[in-house]
Amino acid sequence: MGSFSIWHWLIVLAIVVLVFGTKKLKNIGSDLGGAVKGFKDGVKDGSTSTDTPAAAPGQVAGQTAADKTTIDVEAKQKG
């Protein structure tokens, strides 16, 4: 009674699919995968950024013209 059989899990899965739908579950999976990838990239970038020397106090690190560029975008509504 304490452990669930495969039939219990299949019934739970069927109910979840009926409630949320396959499209919503696919979007959740994609979002979760993107978050994991972003976390891994952040951890990797964090370990390499300590290797670069820091600018001396009072000095500004080299900035490129791309830092001063503004990009105008609009958000799209899902629907």
UniProtKB/Swiss-Prot annotation:
InterPro entries documented for this protein: TatA/B/E, TatA/E
What GO molecular function annotations does the UniProt record carry, in alphabetical order?
protein transmembrane transporter activity
GO terms of biological process kind: protein transport by the Tat complex
Q: Name one Pfam family in it.
A: TatA_B_E
> Any signal peptide, and if so, which residues?
none
Basic and acidic residues bias located where? Answer: 69-79
Subcellular localization(s) per the UniProt record = Cell inner membrane
Q: Write down the Gene3D superfamilies for this protein, in alphabetical order.
A: 1.20.5.3310
User: Disulfide bond among the record's keywords?
Assistant: no
Question: What is the superkingdom listed in this entry's lineage?
Answer: Bacteria
Q: Which UniProt keywords apply?
A: Cell inner membrane, Cell membrane, Membrane, Protein transport, Translocation, Transmembrane, Transmembrane helix, Transport
Location of the region described as Disordered in the Swiss-Prot/TrEMBL record? 43-79
Q: Enumerate the transmembrane spans.
A: 1-21
Mind naming one GO cellular-component term on file for this protein?
Answer: TAT protein transport complex
Membrane topology annotation: Single-pass membrane protein
Known function: Part of the twin-arginine translocation (Tat) system that transports large folded proteins containing a characteristic twin-arginine motif in their signal peptide across membranes. TatA could form the protein-conducting channel of the Tat system.
Under the heading PANTHER family, the entry gives: SEC-INDEPENDENT PROTEIN TRANSLOCASE PROTEIN TATA
Spell out the subunit comment. The Tat system comprises two distinct complexes: a TatABC complex, containing multiple copies of TatA, TatB and TatC subunits, and a separate TatA complex, containing only TatA subunits. Substrates initially bind to the TatABC complex, which probably triggers association of the separate TatA complex to form the active translocon.
Family named by the database record: Belongs to the TatA/E family.
What is the recorded name of this protein? Sec-independent protein translocase protein TatA
Q: What is the lineage of its organism?
A: Bacteria, Pseudomonadati, Pseudomonadota, Betaproteobacteria, Burkholderiales
Q: What gene makes this protein?
A: tatA
